[in-house]
Amino acid sequence: MSITVNQIVLHQLVKNMDGDSIKMESVLRDELLSITPEVEQMMLQLHQGYQNKAKAFGVFQEKSIFAQHLNRLLEQEIEFLGFSQYSTKLLADELGKYNFAESGTLILCQYNFLATDYLFIALLDSRHSMLVDEHLDIRRTEYLDITQFDIAARINLTDLQVNANSNRYLTFIKGRVGRKISDFFMDFLGAEEGLNPQVQNQCLLQAVSDYCDQGELNKEQTQAVKKQVFEYCKGQLSNGNNIELRELSDSLPTLNEQPFVVFTEEQNYGLEESIPPIRSTLKSLTKFSGSGKGVTLSFDAELLNTRIQWDPMTDTLTIKGLPPNLKDQLQKALQSEN
């Protein structure tokens, strides 16, 4: 699938030391980039890379300066270039407050994908490498790293304009180096956390468990329902889709003459109609897993009290019938000791 790039520009943030303090300077383009096949290919790669990142959701705060200028852009009161230049200066001021600030190239792009308009913002690093020129000489070169980036956000402009009460129109990358990366970018955007997918997934799992309990299902029936939920969610995850609560409900058996979606509404679980799936959380529908003190365990939930017995009094698990590869390793270890 391709994307349609409408407007795109690059600016630079340059780190300078002013005594003991950091000062970020803005180097601004005075015109937008021409939309060439190379530019479209770059944005497609950035779009695909962003899709695969772990993201959190956010919403603009009431006094967000960035949101005010974005609204002026959407109302066509200002041009995209002026908006991008102001945003770059705003980010430079915010980034200068942190000692981890580094130089980078800021990209702002307004594009369309699957009938949805987006504004993509990312701070990209430059990398050094070598190239062979036309004379077969080795020269140093510098390139924009569009495969590895941790500082980025995307605004669903269509959702923002159509649904004023949305809590998921803004997404940003959850940085691996700690909250500080996410925090400064959220401060720059004037945003706060919106939808929490982790909480939504956990509430969904609890609702499924409670639904089975109130339906007075036995262990086997409960496991069958949970497996059905997991298979649906796994399918949505594989296709890049959200969990649609009503669609999920329609696929499940009706218990006590009450559909699952009605049960969740009456019990006030606070579930959204559409929930971003989280694989690690959903796995607990059909598996038990855990790790600690050098031990990692994972097994199908249906094996509990059959092949696997748990004694809470002695805090022990008894496994009947070890996996062949594990048994083989243990036998080899025993032989080497003897």
Curated annotation (Swiss-Prot):
InterPro entries: Nucleoid_associated_NdpA. Its main location: cytoplasm. GO terms for cellular component: bacterial nucleoid; cytoplasm. The keyword Cytoplasm applies. The keyword Cytoplasm applies. It is found in: Cytoplasm, Nucleoid. Keywords: Cytoplasm. One of its GO terms (molecular function) is single-stranded RNA binding. Belongs to the YejK family. HAMAP family: NdpA. This is Nucleoid-associated protein CGSHiEE_07855. It comes from Haemophilus influenzae (strain PittEE). The lineage of its organism: Bacteria, Pseudomonadati, Pseudomonadota, Gammaproteobacteria, Pasteurellales.
